[in-house]
Every structure is written in structure tokens, then in C-alpha cells.
């Protein structure tokens, strides 16, 4: 028992519960596991005895507080995992709530060049990316994205590539690899695709690429995200676009994928 508690203390109380093999996550833990209340679409939530809690800053609206997860991911992935900082050049693939949060995190960290890509369905979201601090936006359906990246970087490529797409398969990995600078870039990848036939391992090795996995965030990232959301430094209302009542959960989920103008949806439990 002492050994078990030592492991839990080191991983959870040490702020990085992502590495805990027995960790529970709302929205991911099966409802078959007692007490079966591992979702958040309700007026009340069940908190186990060792739940990790964060205090929402006074005055922060529920809608903006709801952006804390993508914002914490932005801080974790871009800053802590991939080392984005002063004078970094960054490629962000995907202008959804996650990609836009990455724009804010990178801008706040001092990145000198932020490039955001999207498809023809993302015209409005790419406009929002510009308003939040992106220097270059690329519609991959209308332009050659690699040529645009090389143009923006003077042929050097970017220091960091962040994959914030959904359902794009291996394309963001291949494009990110091509867009990275000649040597020593860092690439964040998603884990949607279980296998990757003909993975370009030689290219990864030759370019001395560091690969990081997008896997949630730690305690510190969440705390910093809440501070960022409460700072009023960015027009975050551009991300928190829509509100739905609890009875309209299905419509809310469908809305996110149906319209370019819907970015982050808030479910109001008492509405």
C-alpha cells in the first residue's frame, strides 16, 4: 500500500497525472465503472475523493472558463512540450478551438511568426486566427501550403509544427515534417491513426526531428490557462461563440461540426 501511494503522489500530486496508469478522466472513463457518473453534461458532477480541482478566477464567465481545456492544451503542447518561446516560428494546423488556443499561447510566449492552416470550410475561423495574433493564414484548398510556409519563412521552414486537426489522418504529420526547418525542428502529433504505413522514418532522422505526442495537460498548464482567460488580453469572445441549454446537447455537438462560425459551444446546465 505504501508503494502504491508513493506512485500516485509522485504522478498526481506532482502535477502530471497524465502518466498515472490508473487515472480517471471525465468524458473518457466508461460508465460501466462504479459509480457510473463520469460525464459532465449535468447540473451536478460526481467528484471522487482524490479529484483534481482548480479555482476559477473571480469574474471569469462560465463561457470563457469552459475554454480552459483547449487553452491548457495550448500551453502544454506549444510551450512545455515543444518549447515555443521568444522568436519561435510556428505552424498550427487546424483553426478550431484547439488551434486558436495555440495561437494565443504562442503569441503570449513571444513567437515571432505564427502560421495557421485550414480548409475551405474554415474561412471564418482563419479570420479569427488573424485577429488573435496569427501572422499568416493559409487555405490549403486554395493555396499551396508548403510554398506559402517557405515564402513566409524565407525558405527556412518553421521551428515547430502543431497538429490541431481532427480526422485528417496522416496528412498533418507529412505536411508538418516537410514544413519544419532543415535540422532540429519539433513536431506535435495527434494519435487518431493507429497505424502509419510507410512512415518516413529516414526523413525524421535526417532532419533531426523531435516528435511529441498531444496528450492532455498537466496541473500547471491548467492554472496558467485560467490566468490567461482572466487576463482580458485577447478577444476570447471570438472563440466562445454559442450557448445551448442542457436539453440541447445533441444539437450543440452537431453545431460544432456543421458550421464554420461555431467554434466553442457552452452548455448551460440550468438553462
Task: Identify the function of each model-found stretch.
Residues 53, 91, 115, 186-188, ...:
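Structural detector of well-ordered beta-strand residues that form the stable sheet scaffold
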Residues 95, 118-119, 192, 216, ...:
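Cofactor-binding loop segments of dinucleotide-utilizing enzymes, especially the Rossmann-like FAD-
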Residues 57-143:
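Mid-domain Rossmann-like dinucleotide-binding core that forms the NAD(H)/NADP(H) cofactor-binding site
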Residues 3-4, 8-53:
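Glycine-rich phosphate/adenylate-binding loop and adjacent beta-alpha elements
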Residues 81-86, 108, 123-127, 131-210:
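Glycine-rich cofactor phosphate-binding loops and adjacent beta1-alpha1 units
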Residues 143-144, 151, 155, 171-178, ...:
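C-terminal hydrophobic helical "lid"/dimerization subdomain
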Residues 186-188, 199-238:
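Rossmann-fold dehydrogenase core element
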Amino acid at each position: 500500500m505504501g508503494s502504491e501511494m508513493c506512485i500516485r503522489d509522485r504522478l498526481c500530486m506532482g502535477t502530471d497525472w497524465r502518466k498515472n496508469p490508473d487515472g480517471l478522466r471525465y468524458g473518457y472513463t466508461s460508465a460501466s465503472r462504479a459509480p457510473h457518473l463520469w460525464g459532465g453534461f449535468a447540473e451536478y458532477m460526481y467528484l471522487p475523493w482524490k479529484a483534481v480541482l482548480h479555482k476559477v478566477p473571480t469574474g471569469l464567465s462560465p463561457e470563457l472558463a469552459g475554454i480552459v481545456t483547449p487553452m491548457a492544451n495550448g500551453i502544454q503542447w506549444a510551450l512545455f512540450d515543444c518549447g515555443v518561446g521568444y522568436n519561435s516560428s510556428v505552424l498550427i494546423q487546424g483553426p478550431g478551438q484547439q488551434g486558436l488556443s495555440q495561437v494565443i499561447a504562442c503569441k503570449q510566449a513571444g513567437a515571432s511568426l505564427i502560421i495557421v492552416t485550414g480548409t475551405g470550410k474554415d474561412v471564418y475561423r482563419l479570420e479569427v486566427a488573424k485577429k488573435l495574433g496569427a501572422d499568416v493564414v493559409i487555405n490549403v484548398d486554395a493555396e499551396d501550403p508548403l510554398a506559402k510556409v517557405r515564402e513566409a519563412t524565407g525558405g527556412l521552414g518553421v521551428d515547430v509544427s502543431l497538429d490541431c486537426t481532427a480526422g485528417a489522418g496522416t496528412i498533418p504529420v507529412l505536411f508538418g515534417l516537410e514544413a519544419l526547418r532543415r535540422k532540429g525542428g519539433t513536431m506535435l502529433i495527434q494519435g487518431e491513426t493507429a497505424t502509419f504505413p510507410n512512415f518516413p522514418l529516414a526523413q525524421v532522422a535526417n532532419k533531426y526531428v523531435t516528435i511529441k505526442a498531444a496528450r492532455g495537460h498537466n496541473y500547471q498548464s491548467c492554472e496558467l490557462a485560467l490566468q490567461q482567460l482572466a487576463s482580458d488580453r485577447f478577444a476570447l469572445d471570438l472563440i466562445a461563440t454559442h450557448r445551448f441549454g442542457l436539453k440541447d446537447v445533441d444539437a450543440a455537438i452537431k453545431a460544432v461540426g456543421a458550421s464554420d462560425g461555431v467554434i466553442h459551444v457552452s452548455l448551460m446546465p440550468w438553462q
